[in-house]
Amino acid sequence: MAPEDTNPQSSHRRTRSTSRSRPTTPLRPSSRSSFRSSARGSVYGDNAAFPLNAFEPAFAELADAVADLEANMMHFQLMHESLARFSESFASFLYGLNMNAFCVDFPEGPITESFKRMKLKEEEMQASSQIPSAWRGDPPISTPTAIYPRTDIRILIVKSGGYTWWKRRASWGSG
């Protein structure tokens, strides 16, 4: 066994560090003394009938800590099961959205029926308000307004009833 250092200055130097990376936390009362010192006291005349009785408080504390750990792990298990159920349900929802995207055609712009519905709605609004279209300030449906020579894509801008539609067309014929 190595001799213990009884110099108070050396132990004082060790505990007094000026560059601590994190704050220190005081130890719990049972952790301040080691098992060795408690066993030494019982062996060398602590008036105990059985020397291992000195470990009884430490083992009781260990049993309590293990019971707390078991309860916390049970809570973790419940949380894991809840998250797994949610993840499975959410994955099913995303899969349904993905399959819906494959089964339903989403056009990039309005289709012919959209223009027909808009025209009917506009006629209904005009009939109900009896205001001439020239007074409303809506421009008529325009012709292709932009030509991109490198990509040969033309854009049709349609203003009708407060909505603006952009439609990409790859070919318009001669325009």
Curated annotation (Swiss-Prot):
It comes from the Eukaryota. Residues 20-39 have a biased composition (Low complexity). Pfam families: DASH_Dam1. Residues 1-39 are annotated as: Disordered. Disulfide bonds: none annotated. It is found in: Chromosome, Centromere, Kinetochore; Cytoplasm, Cytoskeleton, Spindle; Nucleus. Keywords: Centromere, Chromosome, Chromosome partition, Cytoplasm, Cytoskeleton, Kinetochore, Microtubule, Nucleus. Component of the DASH complex consisting of ASK1, DAD1, DAD2, DAD3, DAD4, DAM1, DUO1, HSK3, SPC19 and SPC34, with a stoichiometry of one copy of each subunit per complex. Multiple DASH complexes oligomerize to form a ring that encircles spindle microtubules and organizes the rod-like NDC80 complexes of the outer kinetochore. DASH complex oligomerization strengthens microtubule attachments. On cytoplasmic microtubules, DASH complexes appear to form patches instead of rings. Belongs to the DASH complex DAM1 family. This is DASH complex subunit DAM1. It comes from Chaetomium thermophilum (strain DSM 1495 / CBS 144.50 / IMI 039719).
